[in-house]
């Protein structure tokens, strides 16, 4: 295709120069509208039809779905447009200026994962898209780094059903077919304050929390014993007590105590089943101390995800790469996209650089990724190879 678009490096540069931070703090949170419009302009130049979708209950966030070709099936290439916030004091260069140094491209979002869109657009230069017999979709989502609101909303409302989807998170071009889910809850105990000289006149929230943690530790052991998937390095669900706060003085009965905890379930352990287990575990404390214990989700839970190893689409990717699909413990948008079609997580860059100061992608990924993008489109969208 003879299309006038910026060079690959210039595509990358403009993506990195367009801030799109997601944060729970409204002061830090940013709209991704400018980045969505940038992508829309490039993709329209390539002949895609563009749909921009406001994502409800967000601070000015949008999804973009770009479609080229018609018919059924096809390929969906997905990525999120947002980045995490950055610690200015720990970066040695401007996070919004693409910096090439010693074979690496530095900048916020170079690996995780705005750069993925540059790879897609650059690969399309060499493909005769007039020969597509199955559609090519490109999805750019919002708020993956916080609530995953964009992917949730898209999956719940779209009518498209591709044959296959790739989410371009940084996996070092290693195909990922499964990951654990994530639930994060606040356990809050409301006691009754009083002078420590007469403990019977108060209700010590720290003691009730100790009782609660004892029950939760029992649940942790049950999960470890009951659920096992040897495909994972850590083959059982994990539970972590990550934050606790309570009390204000040694001579005062603690009135309030709060614990933040998370659970990472294996695929197949549903969020509802896990929520039921959690409340069942804490039921004895609630029964003994009515009205004093509450459980509140810190964010919308993310289910575990798994693409069957024997799916024919997985075999195509494994053959292209010469590598077997693996599992990881971190979370992506895959559970939501998997509801539409078989999905793998596969992209350039290393997860080790994600969310780090001086984030970078090694330039050694450029040619293999560009080649892979072309192969994916040929295999799933072009006449002679579309399945």
Swiss-Prot record:
It comes from the Bacteria. NCBIfam families: AcOrn-deacetyl, PRK05111.1. The keyword Membrane does not apply. It comes from Proteus mirabilis (strain HI4320). Its EC number is 3.5.1.16. It is an enzyme of class 3 (hydrolase). The active site is at 82, 144. The gene is argE. This is Acetylornithine deacetylase. It catalyses: N(2)-acetyl-L-ornithine + H2O = L-ornithine + acetate. Catalyzes the hydrolysis of the amide bond of N(2)-acetylated L-amino acids. Cleaves the acetyl group from N-acetyl-L-ornithine to form L-ornithine, an intermediate in L-arginine biosynthesis pathway, and a branchpoint in the synthesis of polyamines. Belongs to the peptidase M20A family. ArgE subfamily. Keywords: Amino-acid biosynthesis, Arginine biosynthesis, Cobalt, Cytoplasm, Hydrolase, Metal-binding, Zinc. One of its GO terms (molecular function) is acetylornithine deacetylase activity. Its cofactor is Zn(2+); Co(2+); glutathione.
């Amino acid at each position: 295709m003879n299309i006038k678009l910026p060079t690959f490096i210039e595509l990358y540069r403009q993506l990195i120069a367009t801030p799109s931070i997601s944060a729970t703090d409204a002061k830090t949170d940013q709209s991704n509208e400018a980045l969505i419009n940038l992508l829309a302009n490039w993709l329209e130049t390539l002949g895609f039809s563009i749909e921009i979708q406001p994502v409800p209950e967000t601070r000015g966030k949008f999804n973009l779905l770009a479609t080229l070709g018609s018919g059924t099936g096809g390929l969906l290439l997905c990525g999120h447009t947002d980045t995490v916030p950055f610690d200015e004091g720990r970066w040695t260069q401007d996070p919004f200026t693409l910096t090439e140094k010693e074979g690496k491209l530095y900048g916020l979002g170079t690996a995780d994962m705005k750069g993925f869109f540059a790879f897609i657009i650059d690969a399309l230069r060499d493909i005769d898209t007039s020969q597509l017999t199955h559609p090519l979709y490109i999805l750019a989502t919002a708020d993956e780094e916080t609530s995953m609101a964009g992917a949730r909303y898209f999956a719940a409302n779209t009518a498209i059903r591709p044959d296959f989807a790739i989410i371009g998170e940084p996996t070092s071009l290693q195909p990922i077919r499964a990951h654990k889910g994530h639930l994060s809850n606040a356990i809050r105990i409301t006691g009754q304050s009083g002078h420590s000289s007469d403990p019977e006149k108060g209700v010590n929230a720290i003691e009730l929390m100790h009782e609660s943690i004892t029950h939760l530790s029992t649940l942790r052991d049950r999960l470890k014993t009951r659920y096992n998937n040897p495909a994972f390095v850590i083959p059982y669900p994990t539970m972590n007590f990550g934050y606790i706060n309570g009390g204000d003085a040694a001579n005062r009965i603690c009135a309030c105590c709060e614990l933040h905890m998370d659970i990472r379930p294996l695929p197949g352990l549903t969020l509802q089943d896990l929520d039921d287990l959690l409340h069942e575990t804490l039921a004895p404390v609630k029964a003994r101390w009515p009205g004093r214990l509450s459980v509140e989700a810190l964010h919308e839970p993310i289910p575990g995800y798994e693409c069957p190893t024997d799916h024919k689409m997985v075999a195509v990717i494994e053959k292209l790469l010469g590598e077997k699909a693996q599992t990881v413990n971190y979370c992506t948008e895959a559970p939501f996209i998997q509801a539409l079609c078989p999905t793998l997580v596969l992209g350039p860059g290393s997860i080790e650089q994600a969310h780090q100061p001086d984030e970078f992608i090694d330039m050694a990924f450029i040619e293999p990724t560009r080649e892979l993008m072309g192969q994916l489109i040929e295999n799933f969208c072009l006449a002679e190879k579309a399945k």
